[in-house]
Amino acid sequence: MPSTPLSAAVEALSEDAAQARHAELSRAIERANQLYYNEDAPELTDAEYDALRQELEAIEARFPALTGTTEASAGVGAKPSEKFAKVRHAVPMLSLGNAFADEDVDEFVARVRRFLNLPAEESVAFTAEPKIDGLSLSLRYEAGRLVTAATRGDGEVGENVTANALTVDDIPETLSGENIPEVLEVRGEVYLSHEDFAAINARQEAAGKPLFANPRNAAAGSLRQLDPAITASRPLRFFAYAWGEVSEPFTDTQSAVLERFRGWGLPVNPRTKLCRSAEEMIAHYRTIEAERAGLGYDIDGVVYKVDDLGFQRRLGFVSRAPRWALAHKFAAQEAITELLAIDINVGRTGSLNPLARLKPVTVGGVVVSNATLHNEGYVQGVGADGEPIREGRDIRVGDTVIVVRAGDVIPKVRDVVIEKRPADAVPYVFPDTCPACGSRAVRELNPRTKKLDAIRRCTGGLICPAQGVERLKHFVSRNGFDLEGFGQTYIEVLFEAGLVKQPADLFRLEFEPLKAAIVARRETLSAQRRSEGEPAPKKPTKKKGEEEDKAIKNLLASLDARRTIPLNRFLFALGIPQIGESTAKALAKRFPDMPSLMAALEAATREQAGRDWLELSALPRIGPGTRDRLFETLDPLPGEAMQDLSLGARLRGRLTPSQREAVLAHYGSEEKVDAALERAASQRPGDAYRLFADDGEIGPVATDSLIQFFSEPHNDAAVRALLEEVGTEPLATTTSAAAFAGKTVVFTGSLEKMTRSEAKATAERLGAKVSGSVSAKTDLVVAGPGAGSKLKDAEKHGVKVVSEDDWLAMLAEA
C-alpha cells in the first residue's frame, strides 16, 4: 500500500514522541467521547474525530506496546451517564475500524482473505450499507416482545432507555412473523430526518430554547430524555443492522439476517447491497456518496461486512473492533477563518496545551470557535520528530487558518494561508512558566532523537494546582477509586481549602473541617453573587442543614468503603501516563500487591537502558529491531572468531553496508562508531527491566513511564502515604477458559486447520500469551508438520507439546 502523509509522519516518530502524541490523542478522544456520547454536545465533526482515531491507531500499529494503555485505545464510546439505570450488554457493542481511501478497502479485503487462508478461486461476499450518523441502540426482545432498550455506553454497559424507545414509531414493541428466536438482541441506529430536524429546531426557536447543532445531537438528546413524553414529541426513526445475543442461530449470512429483520417488522436500510469484490464495494460507496445530499438523513460513510457468518466467527475481533467489518468514511470538511488568540491550559500530566480561539465559522453544519493546536512544536511548524511540518510555516495570532473537522472531537488548525498573514503578525512565544503555578515549563531533550520534545511541560508536579486537581479528579473517578459523591466540585473545594493535596489526604478527612470547607465555599459564592447585584440566597433551614450533614457523612462513608481496592484500579487511579485500564490489569495479573510491584520497578530502574543504547535505535536504517538483533550475542560469530577484532569492530561488521553508512555519518569515524557500539553494549537493559518491557501487555513505553513516575521522590512518597491509608487486593479473575488464562503458548510448524493469525487470536482471546520463542517459562507448544528447533527447545525445558488436533480439542473444552 502506498505511503501516506500520516503513515510517513508516524514512521518518523521516536518512541518518546509517539508516547507523548498517543497520550495527547487519547485525551482528545476521551474528551470527545464524553461530549459525544454522554453530553450530546460534540466539539468536533466526525471527520476530525476519525482523523484523531486514525492517527492513534497508526501510532499503535508501529508501537504495539501503546495499544490498550488508555481508555481511548482500549474502550468504545464513553461511560454511561449516571442519569439512567445501567444495562450490561450480553454481547459488547463494539466500534468499527475505519477506511479513508480506496486502498484501505483493497487492503481490508486482502487482509480478510489472508486471515482465512482462502485459495484464489474462492470468493468472499460483503454487504455494503450506508453508515447512519445517529445514536447506537440495542433492543432486547424476549418471546418477540421488547423488554429492554439500551444505548451503547462504553460498549460493555449502556443506559436503559426502554420507555423512550417504545415511543419511536419505527421500533416495534412486538415482532411479527415466523421463527423468531426466544431471545434476540437487535442493534441499530436512532436518527432524525433533515425535515424533522428542521421542524424540531423551529419549535425550539419559537420557545426561546437553544437550537440543536445537528440531527445527530438532536436524536441523541431526544432519546436520552428523562421524560419519555419529550421523546415521543420528536419523530425519531430507526434502522436495524446487527444483533447481539440470540438464543439460537437463525441464518448463516449477514444479508439473510437483514431479510429476517425486515420480515419481523424491523426497518432495514434499503440501500444495502451485496458485493463480491473490493471494486464492487468501492463502486457502491461512490453511488452512496453521490446520493448523500438527497437521502434526507445524515450518513458519514459506508459499512462493509463479511457476509458469511461462519467467516465472521473465524475472523473474530481485535481490540475494540471486529476483523470482519470496516467503515469507509467520507472525507473531512474544512473552513477558513481568523485566529483571534492562543490560550494555554495545563493538562493533568503537566503539558502546556495551546488552544486556538477562532472567529466563529461553520464547518460541516456546526459552528466552531475553538480548535486544538496540539503542542508548542506544532505551533512552530515542527513535528514530534523535530522535522518541519506545513513546510515549516508557524502559526501566529491574526493568521488566516484552515480549520478541519474530522469527527466529533475538538477541531484542529490544519494550516495557515500564508498569503493573508498580516504584516504585524509576530511568532507566538510560549510561556516559560506554568500559567497555573508559576513553576518552570520546559521542553526536555529526547534521548532517543537528540531533539527537543514537541510538548512543553510544567515541572511543578504535585504542587501545581492544575495537575493536582486533575489528578485528584481522575483518582476519584468511576474507573479509579470510584468514590461516590466526590464530584469535580468537591475536589476543587477541598483542594482550594488545603484539605486535600494528594490522594492520601482524602482518607484523612474529618467531619468538621470538611463541613467548614463546604460552608466557606458557599459563603464565597454568595458574596460574589451579591457583588454582581444578584439577590442573596436564603439562609439554610434546619432541615437543609441536617441534609447537608447527612451528605457529608455519606462522603466519609464512601471513603471508608474504599479502604480496600483491587490492585488494577489502584494503579489506574494514580494517573500515571501510559497506564490505562488495560496496562493496569496486566500489571495486576503479574504482581500480587504494590510493594512487590514497586520492588520490581526499583530493580528495573537500576537495569534500565543507557543513553547510547537508546540513541542507536533513533539512527536512520537502524531502529529497535536491528539494534536488538545486533547485540543478541557479544561472543564472536563463526566468521569473526578467526579475526583479532575489538567488540566494537565486530559489532560494526555485522551491520549492512547502508547501516554502516548511517552510523558513520552520525558518529563521524569508525573509531567513534566502535566506541559508541561498545558503550551501547554495556548499557543494554537487564532482565529486571525486560521483565516489564518485553511483556506484550506492558511494553517499553509504559515501563519507562512507570520508572519515571516512581523515580520522582514526591510521587513515591505520595503512593507510600496512600498505602498507609488503604490496602489492595489481587485482581479478580474469571473462571472461564481457566486452562489458558495467563499461560504462555508457542506455535511452531505448519498449522493445517487454522491460520497462524487465527490460532494466535484464539489463544489471546482465552487469556493466553503467545510467544515466538520457547523458554523455561513456556507452558505449551503447539506443533504442526515441519516443527524444528522449537521442538528441541521444548524437550530441553520439559515443556508440554501437543498437536494441532490436540489444541483444537482443548479449545472445544474451554
From Swiss-Prot:
Protein's GO biological process: DNA repair; DNA replication
CDD domains membership: BRCT_DNA_ligase_like, LIGANc
Active site: K131
Listed cofactors: Mg(2+); Mn(2+)
GO CC term (a single one): cytosol
Enzyme type, top EC level: ligase
Pfam families for this protein: BRCT, DNA_ligase_aden, DNA_ligase_OB, DNA_ligase_ZBD, HHH_2
Family as reported in the entry's similarity comment: Belongs to the NAD-dependent DNA ligase family. LigA subfamily.
Protein known as: DNA ligase
Organism: Methylorubrum extorquens (strain PA1)
Lineage: Bacteria, Pseudomonadati, Pseudomonadota, Alphaproteobacteria, Hyphomicrobiales
